Every structure is written in C-alpha cells, then in structure tokens.
C-alpha cells in the first residue's frame, strides 16, 4: 500500500542522529517524515544518562550554534552540570551534564511535535526503494511504501543487532527493542563495505540498596553552567550529586574467574568495541597491573531510584554481575534492576560517504550516527544535523556544506570518518583537532551561527541574540583598546615585591597578561560601560588573552603541511618516542608508515602525536649532525 502523501525527506530512526536530522530538514522547509519503531523512545539515552564531556561538549555547543536541539534539551533535563578541565586552558574545557532520561526524551519530543513540516510515524522500515542507483522511498514492515527525494538512515545499533549476556544471546537493537534484520539484509545486498562493531552497558542498580555513607560525593558546579547559548539556569530542574567508589582486587578476581563464560573471551563476540569505553572485563585483563578502577554512580533521573554505575560495562553472566557488583564498597547489598549486556551491530565503512554524508553509490541516501562507525550521542547528533542539512540542500539543488577542520569539531569528525575510516568505534577528543585553540566551546556560535542562519538552520530569535552578542564583544574590545591606565592606577594590581612600572597601558594590553583577568581589569577603570553578560565577558577575555597563541598555532599547521613528505626510518620503534599514547604507539608499529603524511592519515593518529614524531625526528637529526661533526673533527686530528 502506497501512502498518499509524498515527502521531500524521510528519516529512519528516532535516536540522537535521527531527531537532529529530522529537525534540521524541517527547519529548512522540507516536508519531512520521521519513522521510528517506537514513538515513546524518541531521543532515548540508550546507555549512559549524560551529555557532553571532553570533545563531546564541543560538538553539543556546535550543534546548538547551528540551531540543533541537544543543548537546549539538556538544559531542561540536566540534573547535574560540571565544567571538566576547568583549571586548564579554554581549548580543552568542556561542559558535561547528567540528564534525567525521562525529562530529556520529553524535551526532544516537544521540539519534534512543535516543528512545522515534520510528521512522526511509528513503523519499522524493512526495505529501501530504488530507481537504478537513486533512492525513491522506503517500505515498512506493514507493507506501506513512502516516497521521498532523499532518505537519511540513522539506525544506531539496530542493524543486525545481537545482545550478549554470558553465553546467552538474542536479536535486539537494545534491551527491550527488536533488531532491524530485514533492513540489515537489504543493505548488505548493496555495494557497501560492511563490518561489525560492539558496544556495551553496565547493570543498573537500585539506589535504595546502596550505602552512600561510605562513598565519596561528587556535587555539580556552582554557579551551575548552561549548555545552550540561549539557555539560562532557570531552565534546569533540581540539581543532585553523583557518587564515587572503586573496584578492588576481589572484584578483579571474580571477573577473572568468570572469563570462561564471557562472550568477549570465548569468541562469541567478534565485533570490535570502543577503546575509550572498555568493559570492566577488558579493563581487568588489559590493565592487570592496576588494583582498582573508579566507578561513578550516576542517577538516572529525579523520579527513579535507578543508578547507572559508570565504569563497569559488562557482558558477563548475570550471576557474575551480581557477585562483582556486591564486591564493591557501598554496593555490598546492591540489587541489580537490569543486567548489563554487550551488543553487536552492523556498520558501513564511512569512506564510502561523501563529506555531505551522502553515500557514493546510492544517490539521495544519507547515513548518520553509529551506522558510520561512531560511538556516542553527541557524535551521532552532529552527523544527524549535517545529514539532514545536506539532504535539504540536495533537494534545493544547492552545494552541500560541511565545516572544515579549522571551523568546527563537526568538520574534524566528518573528515576523519570519510578520509581515514574506522577500525573501532570512533569517539571525539579535543586531541583530534589541529586548531583546538580556536575550536573552543565558548566561541562555537561565533564560528557557526552566521553560516547556520544563511543556510536556513538558525531561527530569527537565535540570530538576533547572536548578533547582539557579537556586537557587544566587538564594542567591549574597542573600549579596552581605547582605555588607558596610568601607572598609579596600575599599582593597585601589583604585589609589594613587584617593581614599580611608570608606563601607561591600555586595558586590552593588560588583559593579555596571564595574571590579570577581566574582573580585575574592570575594577581599574570606571570609564565606559563594562560588560555584564558573562558569555560576552568570557569571550572577550579568551579572545584577547589567546590571540597570539592562536596565530602561532595556525603557523604550526602550515609547517606540518611542509613536513608531509618527510621520510620515517624503516622498522622504527615508536615506543622510543616520548609522549605517544599506547594506542598511537601500537598503530604506528603495526602500520610502519613511510612518511609523516602516511602516519597522519592512520585512524587514531592525532595531530598532537604527529608533533611528537616531528620533535623526535628533529632530535635524531640533530644528534646525527653532532656525530658527523665529531667524526669529521676526529678524522682531521688523526690526519
């Protein structure tokens, strides 16, 4: 049966990628249909109840700057907010929030149902309709066909999904939801390179059975941060604490004893899991020298007693899960409400995608999220927004858009995927970016909102707020440049042991000094109106203070390009290179690249690692030059 209404764009899947894709397409005026197996799980947080973190928070801010929903929904659902790396430089500071699962789903659904040009339908997609190598629509499990000019697949872990608990396994997209088996078979028939990946989740624990008295409390930050550039703290629900505990040697012995029934260690699971979110059994085996691992006990919401024990993801048998949980301090009497499990699923080599996230082999078919080999809500949402945007641009017969690596972490993410591919689930880190000093959380709107407005992603309300903020920043910078401080006034900031300074300085020049912040600066001068808005004040201070560093980083990237063809020694032992992570060392020793350029294109090799390689090579060349000179001098002496 053919559905009478034709659509411009159909989005398949209602997770973080699918909801952002559907909202983006509809915001751009496309008649959009979002198909999902269950309308009650739109925006579901399938694993951890948190948004943001290092690299991930940057993506959330960029999604927000382009008009996306994730940041605003988190502000309405966040029950604890923290700034990670707050003592470090602004490039690596990152917002992270614990979210109430129910409130987050509700916030996303409100936005979907309020969005013009967007319809929702609960139905499972089993097949794709093609005319030659062009997508024309989809077919559901009820035999209903829907026509569209573009289709965005955001199917998460549902393609051929198999869940594992010990020796038991069953088909599932996640616990409680069926896998997409027919659609997986259909995609495998196409000229696409397919592989299997794996992820996992920990058992959930009833908070009423936890002894919090002996645990370490982890409260949120004060003042409470916000995620969205349009957000404020009045949107936040009640704030609560998380808690910390640790595994111990008894825990590890229980895990080691149970490995003979672990699907990870008995060959049942073939998919590769996320390196940076390993299961507890992986941690115990790979880091056998460690006698403890930290566990964060994270509330799943305000109206539930369930706790997410972040750090003990596992697919061990349920009886082993109970034993290992109860071996941990504070959890001796813990009741598990849901067992942990691992899940294997299909993904497709993202190198078969264009930067628009359209497949190269099927015209009008876009992929976003875990189908491309990524892991994480934030990575999925960023891809979804970009896929929805580019599907819309394609229908409008306009050029596709993807930010470059120096414009956004979204650009870094997509460039890494489509040029390097993945061998394991891809997670965003700030270390993956060459330009991270200018790709900060605080300036995501300055980098992207104007483009988003031009493309039709950004609302008039957001644009007006952005324009006012941008003007306020430039006005304040001008005031700082034109306001000069006399030596007498400057002495107020000096300590008794500092020598007297008889020169005058502009406030702009003073703000460049690492020991002087914007707040101290404002107290020096009553001339002109200082900034009240904290976002504007923060932006001004960072822009001024790091101006020189950003310029130097740009020059460093130019130098990297010049080193592209630098030859690496054959059979080089990368363990000798100081500062390289275990991951980077392992991959370089495995691939043995011939040049710096080849090394840079290996999946997982970061710009920071390339810098360390260059330093190592330069030191080696310097030592060789000294030896040659010594030999030359020695030869002259003998003669």
UniProtKB/Swiss-Prot annotation:
The keyword Cytoplasm applies. Its cofactor is FAD. Homodimer. Heterotetramer of two MnmE and two MnmG subunits. SMART domains: GIDA_assoc_3. GO terms for biological process: tRNA methylation; tRNA wobble uridine modification. InterPro entries: FAD/NAD-bd_sf, GIDA_C_N, MnmG, MnmG-rel, MnmG-rel_CS, MnmG_C, MnmG_C_subdom, MnmG_C_subdom_sf. Belongs to the MnmG family. It is found in: Cytoplasm. This is tRNA uridine 5-carboxymethylaminomethyl modification enzyme MnmG. The lineage of its organism: Bacteria, Pseudomonadati, Pseudomonadota, Betaproteobacteria, Nitrosomonadales.
């Amino acid at each position: 049966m053919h559905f009478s209404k034709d659509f411009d764009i159909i989005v398949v899947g209602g997770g973080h990628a699918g909801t952002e894709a559907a909202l983006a397409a509809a915001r751009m005026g496309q008649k959009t249909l979002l198909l999902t197996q269950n309308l009650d799980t739109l925006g579901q947080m399938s694993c951890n109840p948190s948004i943001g973190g290092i690299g991930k928070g940057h993506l959330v801010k960029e999604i927000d700057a382009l008009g996306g929903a994730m940041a605003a929904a988190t502000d309405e659902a966040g029950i604890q907010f923290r700034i990670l790396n707050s003592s470090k430089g602004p490039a690596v500071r990152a917002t992270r929030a614990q979210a109430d699962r129910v409130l987050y789903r509700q916030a996303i659904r409100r936005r979907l149902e309020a969005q013009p040009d967007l319809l929702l339908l609960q139905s499972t997609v089993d097949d794709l309709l093609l005319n030659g190598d062009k997508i024309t629509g989809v077919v559901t499990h009820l035999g209903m066909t829907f026509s569209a000019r573009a289709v965005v697949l955001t199917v998460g872990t549902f393609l051929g999904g198999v869940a594992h608990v010990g020796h038991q396994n069953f088909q599932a997209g996640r616990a409680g939801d069926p896998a997409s088996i027919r659609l997986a078979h259909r995609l495998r028939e196409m000229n696409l390179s397919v592989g299997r990946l794996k992820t996992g989740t920990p058992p959930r624990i009833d908070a009423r059975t936890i002894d919090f008295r002996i645990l370490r409390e982890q409260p949120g930050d004060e003042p409470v941060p916000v995620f969205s550039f349009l957000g404020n703290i009045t949107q936040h629900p009640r704030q609560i604490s998380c808690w910390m505990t640790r595994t111990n040697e008894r825990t590890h012995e229980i895990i080691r004893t149970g490995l003979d029934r672990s699907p990870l260690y008995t060959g049942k699971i073939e998919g590769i899991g996320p390196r940076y979110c390993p299961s507890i059994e992986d941690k115990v085996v790979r880091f056998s020298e460690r006698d403890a691992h930290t566990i964060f006990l994270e509330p799943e919401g305000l109206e539930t007693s369930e706790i997410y024990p972040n750090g003990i993801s596992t697919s061990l048998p349920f009886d082993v899960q109970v034993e290992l949980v109860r071996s941990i301090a504070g959890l001796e009497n813990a009741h598990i409400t849901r067992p942990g499990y691992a899940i294997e699923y299909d993904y497709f080599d993202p190198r078969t995608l264009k930067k628009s996230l359209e497949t190269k082999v099927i015209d009008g078919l876009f992929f976003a999220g875990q189908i491309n080999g990524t892991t994480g809500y934030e990575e999925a949402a960023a891809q979804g927004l970009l896929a929805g945007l580019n599907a819309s641009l394609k229908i409008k017969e306009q050029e596709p858009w993807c930010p470059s690596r120096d414009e956004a972490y979204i650009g870094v993410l997509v460039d890494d995927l489509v040029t390097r591919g993945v061998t394991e689930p891809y997670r965003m880190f700030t270390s993956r970016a060459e330009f991270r000093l200018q790709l900060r959380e605080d300036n995501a709107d300055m980098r992207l909102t104007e483009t988003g407005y031009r493309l039709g992603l950004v609302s008039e309300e957001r644009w007006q707020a952005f324009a006012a903020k941008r003007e306020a920043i430039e006005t304040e910078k001008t005031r700082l440049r034109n306001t000069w401080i006399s030596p007498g006034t400057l002495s107020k900031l000096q300590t008794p042991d500092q020598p007297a300074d008889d020169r005058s300085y502009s406030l702009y020049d003073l703000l460049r000094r690492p020991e002087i912040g914007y707040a101290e600066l404002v107290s020096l001068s009553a001339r002109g109106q200082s900034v009240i808005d904290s976002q504007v004040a923060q932006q001004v201070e960072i822009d001024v203070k790091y101006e020189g560093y950003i310029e130097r980083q740009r020059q460093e990237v130019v130098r990297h390009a010049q080193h592209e063809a630098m030859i690496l020694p054959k059979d080089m032992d990368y363990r000798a290179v100081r500062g390289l992570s275990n991951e980077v060392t392992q991959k370089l020793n495995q691939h043995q690249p011939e040049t710096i350029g080849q090394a840079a294109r290996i999946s997982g090799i970061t710009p920071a690692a390339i810098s360390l390689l260059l330093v190592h090579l330069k030191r080696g060349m310097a030592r060789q030059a000294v030896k040659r000179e010594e030999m030359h001098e020695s030869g002259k002496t003998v003669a």
